[in-house]
């Protein structure tokens, strides 16, 4: 039985990459990214993807694996991440899963739901309902059948459509189908900052990204994948890209865009913290405590600690 694989998770802008790189100076680490948008080639600035220099400092896996015109989902992520973890372990090094996409982390830790494959006809029907009646009406439909499922979907249109597509076909929601068995056991190390500090970090990073070429990156993305396609393209669900595009087009000032993106990012960070506590069972500590605990645990790796 392989020892537990460590996961380092924190909300957006908390400094996960910096912390992982600091640990890589002390341990033979390779980073396995767990982020729904750094998988896309060309989405660099707006996703705060590790820079070439950071990627030279420690090997990174699961970055730049698909083109923006391609679809990518949690099942594909889990397959590729498990293959990367196995490869790192086979070379006698330590895989450190680093990221904040809760859905991806849950797929690794808890397995993938054994839901039926998509049915394009039913999905088209649900998407037509979404366009005609709006998200709230669809969420109300879920709520009537299962309040817990409605909460779990977090107002994410893509997940609401998927849940209703499955429910209308089977009478069950995706979470009711059970899951695959995870390939590895994991140990989650979660951290965050006091909320005012995290808010300040988010605002500062959004400002830097908008000044550093994000609007141009959003314009490049729009040329590859029109933002208003139907169904809504997955890549355009990445936070802030629509606002960055509006800056490029002269429709929003950088300041107004920054305020909107900062607000949306703060809301996302709160959802990430909730997911970490409720779905991963890992109450976040301070960055200092997390790096101390993870460093001590890595010092005992591969035995680590038994659960």
Name each model-derived stretch.
Residues 1-307:
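Phosphate/pyrophosphate-binding catalytic cores of soluble transferases and nucleic-acid-acting enzymes
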């Amino acid at each position: 039985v392989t020892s537990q694989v460590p996961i380092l998770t924190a909300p957006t802008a908390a400094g996960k990459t910096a912390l992982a790189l600091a640990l890589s100076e002390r341990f033979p680490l390779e980073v396995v990214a767990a982020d729904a948008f750094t998988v896309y080639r060309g989405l660099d600035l707006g996703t705060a993807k590790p820079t070439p220099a950071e990627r030279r400092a420690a090997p990174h896996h699961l970055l730049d694996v698909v083109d923006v015109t391609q679809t990518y989902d949690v099942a594909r992520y889990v397959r590729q991440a498990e293959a990367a973890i196995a490869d790192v372990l086979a070379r006698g090094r330590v895989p450190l899963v680093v990221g904040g996409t809760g859905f991806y982390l849950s797929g690794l830790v808890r397995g993938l739901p054994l839901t039926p494959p998509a049915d394009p006809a039913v999905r088209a029907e649900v998407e037509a309902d979404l366009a005609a009646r709006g998200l709230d009406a669809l969420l109300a439909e879920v709520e009537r059948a299962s309040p817990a499922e409605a909460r779990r979907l977090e107002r994410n249109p893509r997940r609401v459509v998927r849940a209703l597509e499955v429910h209308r076909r089977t009478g069950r929601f995706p979470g009711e189908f059970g899951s695959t068995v995870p390939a590895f056991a994991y140990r989650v190390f979660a951290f965050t900052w006091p909320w005012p500090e995290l808010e300040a970090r988010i605002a500062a990073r959004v400002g830097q990204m908008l000044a550093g070429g994000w609007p141009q990156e959003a314009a490049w993305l729009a040329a590859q994948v029109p933002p208003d396609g139907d169904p809504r393209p997955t890549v355009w669900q990445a936070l802030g890209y629509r606002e960055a595009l509006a800056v490029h087009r002269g429709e929003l000032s950088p300041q107004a865009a920054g305020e909107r993106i900062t607000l949306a990012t703060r809301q996302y960070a709160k959802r990430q913290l909730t997911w970490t506590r409720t779905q991963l069972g890992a109450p976040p500590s301070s960055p200092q405590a997390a790096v101390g605990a993870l460093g001590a645990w890595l010092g005992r790796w591969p035995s680590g600690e038994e659960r």
